[in-house]
Amino acid sequence: MTGIVVGVDESDGAAAALRFASREAHLHRWDLTAVLAWGYLNQHHGDLSVFDPEYSESQADEALRAYVAKVLGPDEATHVRRRTVCDLPARALLESATGADLLVVGARGRGGFKSLLLGSVSQQCLHHTTRPIAIVRAVERTPETEPAMERIVVGVDGSQTSRAALEWAVQEARLRQASVEALIAWHLPNVGAFPYVGTAFDPAAFEAAARETLDHIVDGVDAEGLPRPIERIVHLGDASSGIITTAKGADLIVVGSRGLGGFSGLLLGSVGHHVAHHAPCPVVIIPPGD
């Protein structure tokens, strides 16, 4: 399935995800498919206390149709494809998103504990998808009051995945006429129990190397059509905290799923994981090859 796939479960997080997905579909001229996973113990009457043993896929589809129309309006809802799947939500979304240009999920769904930063479905999708994925938090906005996207922050570390993230962000910024801020983080090596080794490390040299890496990545991306040049930020400290701090007041964060560190077999790196959990705005995570 190509285009955008968005998970829907009638929660506030799903409403925010659906609105985000609808805007992306219009900008990129992609098809939009809303997916509702249902089961006989997870029905959609608007009353969670009601259990109907005769509940059917047609009833699930009607619930999905009504919800999309409620969130986007009846006219916009006619442009949204619907898919109902009798399966576990994460598995239904991952299967539906095979070949998709973007998978969009709300940060939190109907179930689970409110104290958790990400729900179980969004976490499973985040860790197992091989497609670009957007994590969207619920906000007190309506389609009429949704602000234009003005700032996009991108994490860069010199890896091919971070280059792909910057390219994706630039394409998004070009469509939205938004600014792009590319951030690279650096720090001195941890010498542990051998502090005297640190005298051989020159902070200026490490900072210069980070800036050179950032320049190499940014200069290699076609930024034509942006309202202003890409801003380059060299941050001393942890990459994830630098991205989150810089993104205060931003409208979107874009990071690669895996950077230069960690274990190559993992689909999601520590920076992407931390940013997805703590970001103050929607996050798009780009896998290798996109």
Language-model-derived ranges and their functions:
Residues 1-16, 75, 101-107, 124-167, ...:
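Intrinsically disordered or low-complexity boundary/linker segments at protein termini
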Residues 1-50, 150-200, 224, 252:
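Small/aliphatic-rich secondary-structure junction motif
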Residues 13, 20, 47, 51-55, ...:
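Structural beta-alpha unit
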Residues 23-27, 90, 95-144, 246-290:
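Gly/Ser-rich helix-loop-strand patches that form or flank binding pockets
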Residues 33-35, 81-85, 134, 181-183, ...:
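General small-molecule cofactor/ligand-binding pocket signal
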Residues 42, 92, 142-143, 190, ...:
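Generic structural signal for helix capping and beta-alpha/helix-loop junctions
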Residues 51-63, 200-213:
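A short acidic, glycine-rich active-site loop
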Residues 57, 158-160, 185-188, 204-210, ...:
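Hinge/beta->alpha junction and helix N-cap segments in small-molecule ligand-binding domains
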